[in-house]
Amino acid sequence: MDLIQQQIAHEEALVGAAQNDARIALEKAIAQGSIDRIPRARIMLMRMLPIVTEAIFAHQEAKAAGPAAKLRHLLRIIDAQDLAVMALRAGLSMLINYPTITATKYYTHMGKMLCREIEVRLAFKVNQPYYDRTLDYLKTSRTRSVRHIQKTMDALLDAVLPEEARIDLPDGDYLRLGKFIGDPLIQCGLFEPNRFTGRGGTSVHLEPSPEAREFLQDPSAAMTWGGPGRSVMLAPPRPWNDWCDGGYYSAKAQKHHVLVRRTKHQTKRARQAQLRHLGQDKMPKVYEAVNVLQSVAYEINRDVYEIIERVFNSGGGVLGIPQRTYPDKPEFPLGDEWAKENASEQELEAFNRWKRSVHRWYTGEREHTAKLREFAALYRVVREHHGKAVYFPMHVDSRGRMYYWGTPNPQGSDIAKACLRFHDKRVLGKRGLYWLKVHVANSLGCDKVYFDDRAAWVDERWDDFQRALAEGPENYPGLFPEAESPLCAIAGLLELRAAYASGNPEGYRSGFIVHMDATCSGLQHYSAILRDEIGGAYVNLLPPGLAKADIYSRVLGLVNESLERDRAPGAEGEARGYALLWDKAGLSRSLTKKPCMTLVYGTTFKGVVDHCLDYLDESGVEIPEGVPSYRLGSYMATLILDAIRETVPSAVFAMEWLQRLAKALPDASKDLHWITPLGMQVFQSYPKTEEVRVRLRAEAVEYVTLYEAKDELDPMRNANGIAPNFVHGLDSSHLGLTALACAAEDIPIQAIHDSMGTYASDVDRMHVHIREQFIAMYSGPCVLVELAKQLGVEATPPRRGSLNLEAVRDSWAFFC
């Protein structure tokens, strides 16, 4: 069997695993009682069934009024125990397919499922012979495809039921109906609700309860998760010839893995318009770049994997390797009888602090679950494909941002990156050894000084590193801080040790990948566009000397100056009190790093406030009674954002200019369409949404909000979205152009958005191309002016400074 035949068989097996082993095995175990196949599911079902049945029966018998009362007659059509089994089967299926699911999607699915069951039962009464023939067909075909069964039943309903007998409800009513059978699954402990607040507002997500998480961590369950995107390719991906023709080989895999994904921030109209512009003839360089990037062969670094496996099997929790179990959620500090409306200010502060800690816990728990899934996939790949060349097909989002499919993913966690290296090997040479050392230093946080100093830093600690490798890196937490990338550092040290052990380190053949990262790439783009010498210096567009410019420290310095002014003895007002409180926290650059990094990608003022309050909590600072936490956070957020504005004024100006440009469109209902420097056809059209609010009594949440997207543009969201989407397109363009330039010299690139990696021996040439392509992108007409022309808006060109772009060529810290 050749590689392509192996890959097709591999894809078909993975698709089968995803559709059958994960979903049908669980549903069949519930329906048939196959306890030998999934014993934990059997235990959960048998324990929960009486509780769910009783709760649904209570809903059926209730007389309460309200928006959902008109739907209760539908609930009463089916026996409570039948509904309970149906709901539990669906709920357990969701556990397999989704690590988290929005409450709106969950309830709406339950409501539609209930209505479908009612319709099929009615069809049975209307025409039992037709139903029996349909059932015989399904049995004869021995289908295990849920989708196939659904399509067959659709045909039955179309043939048997008249249109007036079909159930057709608004989404809001499906949601309300679904609550009747969905809430009992939360009450019995299958799911837990979690409330998230983001830029789009507040939403409720349902996640597996601790018992369900334990079920998911069972290796027999984890190893059944599949689909081509959950593994690797064994043959080079098919070159993309069209947006739906490339990547995977089998028809099923191709259908669900197209080149350009639709985003939820697009109207249907915008998506259809974009599809008409996604041909290879309209954006040839995009196709060329993704084909180059996905043609690179990788392999698993078995030595690194064995360290990860050993640490995980001993309990995990060090070197960034997940614990086998996740810590319990923070306990509610105020007692069961506490009521928010009767709370004191001190109690409200304790409540808000607890909410922030729970939010951090859920974030950590999701990351923990993701790492467990990543480790399970890594285990499978090592077991089945160790020593083989493996590949990762590429795709892009609607802005042109490039991603790999597959697990372990080159853009994944420290675990994934450390375990991947190029399959083909190249001689290290003197410079390759040098860059390996720089990589180790970068991975351990020694990344502010010049490259020579980083390499020397590793040499000075070589004996300590050798001892740690011999005795187990997990026993040396001081050498490998988890805040950095300890596993990538260990991978580099293992490669160095192997090179030295060969007796000819410069002649050692290596597939190790060394990455170079941008310094706040979004700010680099805007500073270059407007030729901003001030901002450009702080993001290393200009040569910085022997230590790279640190914008986070610069912003922190300005914040400290403001604090010193506000806390001076003669200062008055609440600002002085806030400044004194923040002084107690002991400010560090971690406070300003995240806002600097996320400003150009659409962070909100509230997001910065929440970040500041999290920093206070983690610093152990108690907010005194009577001090409103949000105002305290707002005070610091304002100082940080003002400091960023002073440090990189061009970036803030460019973002505001872009927003004004979007608002100046002559037709506010028109999609925004522009072309990135790489040639990506971007169609931005944020849809208006209609909001339906439903109370969730079982979760103790006041409302869950259902958003129904309309095929109508929201001008305000469109204006707010243009700046982050525009800079994402610039990031991906720089990456794609650099990958093409490197490919011309046979230098493969591993792409991580604003970070690029290659062979240690080729890092010097990669540095050259990174800089040359950046200079070339901005040496022509101003991209902001070109954007205005593409949008058909007459706009005053923004003022530009005197930054000489050629200086980027000599800035060692531009990517470092």
UniProtKB/Swiss-Prot annotation:
Instruction: Return the GO cellular component terms, semicolon-separated.
Output: DNA-directed RNA polymerase complex
The record's listing under InterPro entries reads: DNA-dir_Rpol_C_phage-type, DNA-dir_Rpol_phage-type, DNA/RNA_pol_sf, RNA_POL_N_sf, RPOL_N
Q: What is its EC number?
A: 2.7.7.6
* Keyword terms, alphabetized: DNA-directed RNA polymerase, Nucleotidyltransferase, Transcription, Transferase, Viral transcription
Question: Where in the chain are disulfide-linked cysteines found?
Answer: none
Give the enzyme class: transferase
Query: Catalysed reaction per UniProt?
Result: RNA(n) + a ribonucleoside 5'-triphosphate = RNA(n+1) + diphosphate
Alphabetized GO MF terms: DNA binding; DNA-directed RNA polymerase activity
Where are the catalytic residues? 517, 593, 754
Query: What biological processes does GO assign it?
Result: DNA-templated transcription; DNA-templated viral transcription
Which family does this protein fall into? Belongs to the phage and mitochondrial RNA polymerase family.
What is the purpose of this protein?
Answer: DNA-dependent RNA polymerase that catalyzes the transcription of viral genes.
Name of protein: DNA-directed RNA polymerase
Query: What gene is this protein a product of?
Result: gp26
